[in-house]
């Protein structure tokens, strides 16, 4: 075998070259995706920003928990205000406003709110004041159980840097900064901002959020294509975003809310959410602190870098203003580029390929068939053969049709087997260890990937027992599988186009690309067939020698590898035809190979691009959903998603599976066994990924009864509670929780030493004669948050001394509400509230909330103590961590009837 033969073998569709290319491509993609999913290093050139100062600001902001209803919140407010006043001093076009005048009322489906804001606003006048400006928003309050390093200390520290930057580099358009308070108590600070005149100066916004514990910030969602363009690599060095998260919000899959919804629904602004999303197990817990943040200072820089780039575009580029561009489709590539286009463009692209693609391929296949037939006639020399029906009957009796049928059916059989096995593996996870994805999602994904590869490889390598006529030659198998895969994606693309057009879903962009590249691969295969020299029995590249028909039908009985001549007949050529029936390469026992070079072009077209997009989407989806299980999200969503991504990552390899080395399958089998065994046997939680449970104490002030309640996943809740001394021996009352679907709440009576201090509530309720109206007078003690629960719906309310009416776009629903929340910017407030009701009777509860505790208030003077929560912090197992159940860690209440 000479050098030329070796070179030919190296580029032929053979086992070793195909396996080498496939393994190399998949490894390169997986490694690249994993590496680029990590935070990049901080650059030396910080482009006018000061990372050191920002990190120092973050440590001040996130020194301790500082919810709206805490004295620590006032400390953070004063720190931020001082920083901004110092940063803007001496610049007459920069204005700071400590907004302690904006009050408002608004409603949602279940409750109404009256809120008194303490936002800190900054306005930097642009050179072109006549043009609409841009709003930049973050909230400085945290939840009561977390210092708020990522939620939302990093966002606030970033805005402080942007203010300093734009004060020194005056923008073209006006920049408005809303560093708001009360977001954690359901977006109250953003609502208060809408009451301020500066909210009318902007037509677009960027909201900075943190729904996790760091990592790379993600373009969570966007209103239209225009604001997404501000995230392109032209402005943002390391863009990161995917339309999947936006679609998840729009469909209600993500059960969360940000100020984004207030700006969109209340003012109709265009804009985007930029938020952290990894490590949700530490979100809203004591681990949302500076020292526990994923990536630390690099995470902070990632948000600063992205926010600076986006803000620069929003304040200068006309492309992100004016024409909205409709619903967007966007995704990043390795954190280096952001691909963005309107959903309408994708729908048009899909329709074109749905119509043109099949027609073009049908024409190419027809031309190929006609060309083959003409060659057969030329080779046959015009001699008569058996008729069509006679040949068909002969083929049927000899079961030759089975081989052809199996060649086209094996893709669908492999797909069915793969889906079936994936379902079984999902069921195994759900029954054996349903929460293992919480801490080991990459192991779970590895098991699904290895199973998908095994099932695809094994089925595609099952031979047909009647395949003695070359119907399973590798080139033909590949081309048949490519066409089956194209048809499969065509069906998916048709469904995706209908759904995408009706529901404005852009996450199907992978199907658009997949169908297009498969069209190209199938077309190249057909064109290669037209250009190649074919024989009656197969492609000349498979090593067959041409025969005239009379000789061909005299071959029966020849053994493979035996060189012979046919007996002479009246149609035998004058020159003898020596024939060796061997595999390509000319030696007995060598494997059958395909055409030189074309398979590689088809592989490069149909595999890498799809696998890249699927791999990135898989990591994003797992990172965003794996730890939502503690919030009550169904586990089938996580495992079903991992399974789907695995199948989509392996399916592009199906046409080439017949030429993959069996040793890769051995490796996949070992990986499957090891990863599945690990995932089914290991405890699902750790100190790195702790199970989140939710704490609240409720105090019945009428009966003087206190109950400690902890809510969590029912499979592990009792095990976590058993570690608490106060729960030892106490009867537990455990019920399904209505507020957090899928979770369970267990309550018990704590000893007197663990009852909260300074829990006092005085109120009076009276009825107006002749009217269906009641007046509540509520006196707070060491709190600024109270609420009223109604057993009967109320249709109107008015807080004395507050603003009249309800915010536009957030009116009380026609059926009324059954809860009224009252938030005061001052302490120990006495509320006077009038409410209208439908019927004559009105009953319910008046309650106040407390959120401060000793260890969370170090350095801040407060009288409130919650020893039961201190017990939870001290004795909860290391694999569990506590978060707040509601706005208040303690709720004290009294009943009323009028």
From Swiss-Prot:
Q: How is the cofactor bound?
A: Binds 2 Zn(2+) ions per subunit.
Name the glycosylated positions.
50, 103, 110, 200, 704, 733, 764
Provide the alphabetized UniProt keywords: Glycoprotein, Hydrolase, Membrane, Metal-binding, Metalloprotease, Protease, Transmembrane, Transmembrane helix, Vacuole, Zinc
Please list the GO terms describing molecular function.
Answer: metal ion binding; metalloexopeptidase activity
What does the record give as cofactor? Zn(2+)
Instruction: Look up and give the membrane topology term.
Output: Multi-pass membrane protein
Concerning InterPro entries, the annotation shows: Fxna-like_M28_dom, M28_fam, Peptidase_M28, PFF1_C, PFF1_TM
Q: Which Pfam families match?
A: Peptidase_M28 (PF04389), PFF1_C (PF22250), PFF1_TM (PF22251)
Q: Which GO terms describe its biological process?
A: proteolysis
Q: Which Gene3D superfamilies match?
A: Zn peptidases (3.40.630.10)
Q: Which residues form the active site?
A: 183 (proton acceptor)
Localization of this protein: Vacuole membrane
Q: Which annotated residues bind Zn(2+) 2?
A: 151, 184, 284
Q: Where is this site: Transition state stabilizer?
A: 283
The portions of this protein that span the membrane are: 15-35, 343-365, 412-432, 434-454, 480-500, 510-530, 594-614, 636-656, 665-685
EC annotation from Swiss-Prot or TrEMBL: 3.4.-.-
Catalytic EC class: hydrolase
Query: Matching PANTHER family, A to Z?
Result: METALLOPEPTIDASE M28 FAMILY MEMBER (PTHR12147), VACUOLAR MEMBRANE PROTEASE (PTHR12147:SF58)
Q: Which family does it belong to?
A: Belongs to the peptidase M28 family.
Per its database record, what is this protein's job? May be involved in vacuolar sorting and osmoregulation.
Report what the protein is called: Vacuolar membrane protease
């Amino acid at each position: 075998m000479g050098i030329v033969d070796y070179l030919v073998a190296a580029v032929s569709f053979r086992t070793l070259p195909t396996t080498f290319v496939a393994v190399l491509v998949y490894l390169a993609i997986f490694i690249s995706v994993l590496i680029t999913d990590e935070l990049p290093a901080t650059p030396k050139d910080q482009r006018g920003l000061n990372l050191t100062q920002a990190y120092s600001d973050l440590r001040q902001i996130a020194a301790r928990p500082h919810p709206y209803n805490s004295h620590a919140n006032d400390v953070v407010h004063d720190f931020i205000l001082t920083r901004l006043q110092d940063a803007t001093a001496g610049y007459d076009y920069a204005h700071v406003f400590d907004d302690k005048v904006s009050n408002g009322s608004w409603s949602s489906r279940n409750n109404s709110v009256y809120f008194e804001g303490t936002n800190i606003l900054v306005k930097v006048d642009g050179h072109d004041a006549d043009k609409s400006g841009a709003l930049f928003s973050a909230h400085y309050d945290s939840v009561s159980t977390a210092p708020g390093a990522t939620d939302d200390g990093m966002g606030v520290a970033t805005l402080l840097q942007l203010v300093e930057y734009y004060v020194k580099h005056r923008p073209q358009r006006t920049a408005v900064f809303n560093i708001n308070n009360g977001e954690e108590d359901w977006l109250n600070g953003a609502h208060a901002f809408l009451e301020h005149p500066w909210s009318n100066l902007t037509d677009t916004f960027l909201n900075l959020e943190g729904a996790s514990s760091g990592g790379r910030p993600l373009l969570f969602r966007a209103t239209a294509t225009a604001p997404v363009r501000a995230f392109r690599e032209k402005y943002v060095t390391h863009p990161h975003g995917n339309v999947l998260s936006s679609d998840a919000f729009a469909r209600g899959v993500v059960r969360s809310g940000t100020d984004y919804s207030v700006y969109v629904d209340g003012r109709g602004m265009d804009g985007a959410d930029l938020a952290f999303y990894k490590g949700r197990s530490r979100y809203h817990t004591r681990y949302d602190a500076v020292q526990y943040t994923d990536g630390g200072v690099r995470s902070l820089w990632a948000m600063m870098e992205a926010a600076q780039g986006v803000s620069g575009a929003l304040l200068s580029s006309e492309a992100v203003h004016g024409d909205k561009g409709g619903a967007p489709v966007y995704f990043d590539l390795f954190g280096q580029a952001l691909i963005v286009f309107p959903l309408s463009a994708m729908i048009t692209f899909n329709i074109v390929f749905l119509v043109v693609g099949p027609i073009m391929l049908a024409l190419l296949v027809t031309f190929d068939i006609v060309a083959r037939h003409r060659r057969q006639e030329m080779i046959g020399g015009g001699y008569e053969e058996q008729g069509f029906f006679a040949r068909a009957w002969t083929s049927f009796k000899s079961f030759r049709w089975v081989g052809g049928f199996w060649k086209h059916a094996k893709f669908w059989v492999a797909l069915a087997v793969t889906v079936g096995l994936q379902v079984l593996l999902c069921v195994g996870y759900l029954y054996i260890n349903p929460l293992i994805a919480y801490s080991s999602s990459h192991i779970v994904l590895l098991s699904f990937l290895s199973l998908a590869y095994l099932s695809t490889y094994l089925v595609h390598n099952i031979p047909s027992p009647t395949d003695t006529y070359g119907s399973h030659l590798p080139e033909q198998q590949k081309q048949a599988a490519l066409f089956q895969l194209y048809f499969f994606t065509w069906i998916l693309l048709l469904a995706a186009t209908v759904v995408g057009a009706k529901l404005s879903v852009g996450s199907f962009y992978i199907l658009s690309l997949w169908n297009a590249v498969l069209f190209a691969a199938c077309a190249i295969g057909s064109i290669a067939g037209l250009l190649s020299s074919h024989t009656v029995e197969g492609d000349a590249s498979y090593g067959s020698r041409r025969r005239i028909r009379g000789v061909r039908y005299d071959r029966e009985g020849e053994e493979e590898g035996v060189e012979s001549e046919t007996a002479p007949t009246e149609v035998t050529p004058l020159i003898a035809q020596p024939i060796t029936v061997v595999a390509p390469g000319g030696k007995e026992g060598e494997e059958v190979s395909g055409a030189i070079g074309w398979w590689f072009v088809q592989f490069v077209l149909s595999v890498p691009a799809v696998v890249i997009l699927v791999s990135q989407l898989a990591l994003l989806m797992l990172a965003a959903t794996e730890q939502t299980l503690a919030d009550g999200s169904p586990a089938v969503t996580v495992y079903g998603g991992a399974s789907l991504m695995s199948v989509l990552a392996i399916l592009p390899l199906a046409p080439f599976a017949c030429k993959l080395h069996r040793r890769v399958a051995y490796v996949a089998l070992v990986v499957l066994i090891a990863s599945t065994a690990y995932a089914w046997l290991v405890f699902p939680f750790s100190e790195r990924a702790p199970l989140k449970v939710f704490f609240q104490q409720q105090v019945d002030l009428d009966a003087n009864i206190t109950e400690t309640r902890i809510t969590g996943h029912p499979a592990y809740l009792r095990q976590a509670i058993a570690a608490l001394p106060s729960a030892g021996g106490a009867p537990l009352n455990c019920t399904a929780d209505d507020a957090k679907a899928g979770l369970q709440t267990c309550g018990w009576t704590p000893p007197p030493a663990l009852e909260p201090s300074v829990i006092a509530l005085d109120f009076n309720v009276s009825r107006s004669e002749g009217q269906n109206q009641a007046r509540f007078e509520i006196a707070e003690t060491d709190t600024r948050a109270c609420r009223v629960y109604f057993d009967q719906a109320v249709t109107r309310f008015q807080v004395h001394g507050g603003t009249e009416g309800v915010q536009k776009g957030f009116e009380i629903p026609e059926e009324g509400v059954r809860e009224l929340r009252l938030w005061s910017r001052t302490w120990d407030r006495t509320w006077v509230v009038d409410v209208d009701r439908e019927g004559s009777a009105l009953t319910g509860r008046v309650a106040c909330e407390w959120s401060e505790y000793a260890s969370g208030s170090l350095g801040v003077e407060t009288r409130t103590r919650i020893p039961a929560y201190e017990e939870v912090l001290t004795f909860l197992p290391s694999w569990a961590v506590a978060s707040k159940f509601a706005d208040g860690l303690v709720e004290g209440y009294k009943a009323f009837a009028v």
